[in-house]
Amino acid sequence: MELTCCNYYGKECFERNLLLSTPTMDLLKKISTSFPDVFILEPRVFGDERGFFLESYNRKVFAELGITHQFVQDNHSRSTRNVLRGLHYQVQHAQAKLVRVIEGEILDVAVDMRRSSAMFGKSEAVALSGENKRMLWIPAGFAHGFRVVSAVAHVVYKTSDYYAPEYERTLLWSDPQLKIDWQLEGEPIVSAKDQRGVKLRDAESFE
């Protein structure tokens, strides 16, 4: 590969060429979870005294990891400590999600809602933060939610389909059957809508 500085000068030119010369698979580390199709993505971070640079999305790299979805929507939420959102999913226009935190920390949770899955009703909880810069890939067929661990958290995520409120469903976050350890610190802050979520035994699901 021919490396050029283009409009980059000095140290920035060196860093750009370093990025271009890095094998694509080395730009993003794939970490397994208890689900074969849910995984953590850890980007390579280029940092110095000025700060850092990373690629949060690269279509080619993601395709090499098996993620070929076309993302159609980006969402950004700001929440304060102990806010709990979820567990949300859409029974039609089901969404795959790529979740990351740009500031603060959350406990991110995915619940398998596919009745044909041996893991139906099971969950995965992952710590995502602005510090660890990890992302969580959640395919369609899962309910998703998170609890804020830090004082404030900014969560951004890509979706593979548009928000469709008429098909949105909420799984009750506190359903004992789910056995989710939210690592609570007192009573969480939950919207009235999420408090009205249904238990797994009564929830609409996927095949």
Q: What are these model-predicted stretches?
A:
Residues 5-6, 13:
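Cysteine-centered motifs
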Residues 25-131, 152, 159-207:
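Non-catalytic, conserved peripheral segments adjacent to functional cores
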Residues 17-20, 136, 185:
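Compositionally biased, intrinsically disordered/low-complexity regions enriched for serine, proline
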Residues 11-24:
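Short, Lys/Arg-enriched N-terminal segments with co-localized hydrophobic residues
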Residues 128-151:
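Conserved metal-binding segment of the jelly-roll/cupin
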